Design a protein with these regions (language model features):
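Conserved RNA-binding domains used in RNP assembly and mRNA/RNA metabolism
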Residues: 1-87
Length: 87
């Protein structure tokens, strides 16, 4: 597959503060995180999008290997935008 770069905006679970015990009222202020991830989409279906930010290309310029992939549930995805990397 030829590499195409995408920006994925998505919501992630958030919580578990590292500041110790907190009041219930303070914990109720915890919101989901807004995330931006960029990479090559290796797979996408109704359940998930598999995004890989680091890829190795073969001699033909096709994606051969990858590292640091993330599977994001589609219900969490806000938008997917292809980036034009050729000017």
């Amino acid at each position: 597959m030829k590499p195409r770069l995408f920006l994925v905006r998505w919501k992630d679970a958030c919580g578990g503060s590292r500041s110790g015990w907190r009041s219930v009222e303070e914990m109720k202020e915890t919101k989901e995180a807004s995330v931006m991830s960029m990479g090559v989409i290796l797979h996408q279906d109704k359940q998930r999008i598999l995004l890989c930010p680091h890829v190795l290309l073969d001699d033909k310029g096709d994606v051969e290997e990858g590292d640091a992939e993330i599977a994001i549930p589609m219900d969490w995805v806000m938008s997917v935008e292809e980036w034009n990397t050729h000017g």
